[in-house]
Regions:
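A beta-rich soluble binding module of mature secreted/lumenal proteins
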Residues: 8-163
Length: 163
């Protein structure tokens, strides 16, 4: 009963994804510039997510960052992604621990595939990523406001320093 009540009390929404993702163009390195982090990445610096399309259609992700500071110990994780059929490649299940697949929704993607926002309906985590290590301040504010407009609380929103 407690789990049921807790689940009902969690904030959730249906965040709209982009219409379509060209999966091949999305592959490669993305610098995480800001996020509402999961526990694992709450002290991340130099965070980079790298995606590679496997022959079976799954996505090999390598998530690397320095823990605690720009020169902190390097942490690396290798979750596996699965595109959800019928979503035009815009919704994935990201598997860190078998058999659980966490929702991963591509909710913003510029036409040049240089900036993206990945979010979740639970409004618990979000990632602003770019192909470059920095964005101009006005763009960072624009995307922060966009994330807030999706319904996210910005209490734990954090920009990630990149070296």
């Amino acid at each position: 009963l407690i789990l049921l009540l807790t689940g009902c009390a969690m904030k959730s929404t249906q965040i709209k994804t982009v219409d379509k993702v060209d999966i091949d163009r999305f592959m490669g390195d993305w610098y995480v510039l800001a996020h509402i982090p999961s526990y694992v990445e709450k002290n991340a610096f130099n965070a980079v997510e790298s995606y590679k399309l496997n022959e079976d259609g799954s996505i090999a992700k390598t998530f690397t960052f320095n823990e605690g500071s720009l020169d902190g110990p390097v942490k690396t994780y290798h979750p596996k992604g699965f595109v959800i059929p019928g979503t035009n490649n815009a919704i994935w299940g990201m598997q860190f621990i078998w058999p659980i697949k966490a929702q991963y929704k591509i909710v913003y993607l510029d036409k040049d595939y240089k900036i993206t926002i990945v979010a979740r309906d639970k409004l618990d985590y979000v990632w602003l990523m770019a192909r470059s290590k920095t964005l101009p301040h006005d763009q960072m504010i624009k995307f922060r406001n966009m994330i807030e407009g999706m319904g996210y609380s910005l209490d734990n929103y954090r920009e990630i320093e990149q070296e």
